[in-house]
Amino acid sequence: MNTLYWLVTITDRHSTDALLALYEEHGITVSLRTVGAGTAVRETLSTLGLEKTEKAVLFAMITAETWPGLQKDLRRKMRIDVPGTGIAFIIPVSSIGGKRALQFLTEHQTFALKEESTLKDTRYELLLVIANQGHTGSIMDAARAAGAGGGTVIHAKGTGMEGAEKFLGVSLASEKELV
């Protein structure tokens, strides 16, 4: 199977460690995490007896083979399908810049590398770059030179970076920027 997905999980911050442990059970050892804030209006929260909370936002690369089992466990163990507990969704990935980066991001997951022979015909594409802090300017310079009108920077902390030297030959700082 040659399909990769960018997994996004948003839930309460107190669930972060449990989610990372669940990811690890499914061979997802590399992820990025950051915080967000819920936007529900005060009246809705009050009606439901809830308080405004900070959210954990986790990003990871997963394979098509990994997703069904993870999705099942997100529902069964994390109760992600219960309203108010969070959301998990996947975005198809069409390419990754470099074989070593691909191996690192899919470590411990089954993935058969295969070169795509045809490009997907899409009107828009989402380009994500994960970089050490401080490189956003050069990334955006390159993106603008290629026609991008702008971008968004998300500050995150990398997890599972211990194995980075094995694949990339360099140590990675845990503080990241997702552009």
Regions found by a protein language model. Give the residues of each.
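Positively charged, small/polar-rich N-terminal and surface patches that mediate targeting and assembly
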Residues: 1-179
